[in-house]
Amino acid sequence: MAIVTLPNKSVAVNPLKQSQALGASLAFLGLKGMIPLFHGSQGCTAFAKVVLVRHFREAIPLATTAMTEVTTILGGEDNIEQAILTLVEKSSPEIIGLCSTGLTETRGDDIERFLKDIRDRHPEISHLPIVFAPTPDFKGALQDGFAAAVESIVQEIPQPGTTRSEQVTILAGSAFTPGDLQEIKEIVTAFGLVPIFVPDIGASLDGHLDEEYSSVTTSGTTVKQLQEVGCSAFTIALGESMRGAARILEDRFNIPYEVFSELTGLEPVDEFIQALAILSSNSVPEKYCRQRRQLQDAMLDTHFYFGAKRISLALEPDLLWSMVKFLQSMGTQIHAAVTTTRSPLLEQLPIKSVTIGDLEDFEQLAVESDLLIGNSNLAAIAKRLSIPHYRLGIPIYDRLGNGHYTKVGYRGSMEVLFGIGNLFIDAEEARVKNFDENFVTGHG
């Protein structure tokens, strides 16, 4: 059981967390024909857009209600109305995801009433789904905003219908990359199941070149698929943060669910594969038996480099849980853990303590580590401390292929093992080289 600590300071120095609105927009981008709409100032949207564009290296559709000093005082209903009508006219979206920001949450705009009144005044948009997620960026973090968006989606769009025994809903949390979702989709379909991902950034943000420019997402989960979620026989929630959305589906449609908090490592993947076999009443495909043996061999090859290594992590709670459990299974020691927001998982972490803080806290705690794990904002810390840095999370600016990176399943687990193992090998070679140079030149 970990002790959760919060540093006693009134300012974030070198922040680790990203805003809830950014997380919600990421979730909305996993829907086809979507354009996320930020109800706030232009700067809020511009910052989120820059982060996502630099991370995925893709064109990201984001819109804003462009609140000013005057409209903030007088109220933002007119801005929302004009923004929605403009998007409908110029972009023809199939669905709009509306996110609040710290500015409009502080003012207290009643956005749900605004939307009702706008629909009453404009019956021509009555067919258009508009999903609202409350995402104040003065509290919580990316993971919270992502979860809030998914909960709003499953609360508003799915419709009741006849249960389809082969159909499963997969609620994919913010810890999973587009490459992760593609791997999970391949595994699930191999068992003869028909998955509906909510959301499916594996289809929309996987880095593909469309024939022409579009101001909305061209791939992802469709509105029709979202409406059919109520017909699923089972819900698979990937990440503890998706439990709330799974409960909503259980309450609305009496659909049972199971939460998988991790899909990296031999035992978690075994449990996932076994659950799919039971759910589908099909045997495990031979290719996954072979991949399992490959992972076992990879664990044998790499465990010499992992044993007793001290690792410090700065990640969102769901991702932190998954990596801590995986790294400990390989014999490493968790030297420090810093995260962004509260989660039921934090107290259950099998480490001494976890800090909800910023990168200043992380730099102080990570001294004498053998490896740092976190997003690209850790790069300067890694350089100052002369410690190798394994990039994980959002944003990653200084590496290519973030949309295709995979860390789940047997194959993804091997990718993580080899990636971290090679860093340990490079660090050891550099240490030996420095020792030899100092020995030859006589420096102590």
Swiss-Prot record:
The pathway is: Cofactor biosynthesis; Fe-Mo cofactor biosynthesis
**Organism expressing this protein natively:** Nostoc sp. (strain PCC 7120 / SAG 25.82 / UTEX 2576)
Instruction: State the PANTHER family in the record.
Output: LIGHT-INDEPENDENT PROTOCHLOROPHYLLIDE REDUCTASE SUBUNIT B
State the UniProt keywords alphabetically: Nitrogen fixation
GO MF term set:
nitrogenase activity
Under what name is this protein listed?
Nitrogenase iron-molybdenum cofactor biosynthesis protein NifN
Q: List the disulfide bonds.
A: none
InterPro entries (alphabetical): ChlB/BchB/BchZ, Nase/OxRdtase_comp1, Nase_comp1_CS, Nase_Mo-Fe_CF
This chain is encoded by the gene named nifN
GO BP annotations of the record are: nitrogen fixation; protein-containing complex assembly
Organism classification:
Bacteria, Bacillati, Cyanobacteriota, Cyanophyceae, Nostocales
The domain of life for this entry's organism is: Bacteria
**Any Pfam family:** Oxidored_nitro
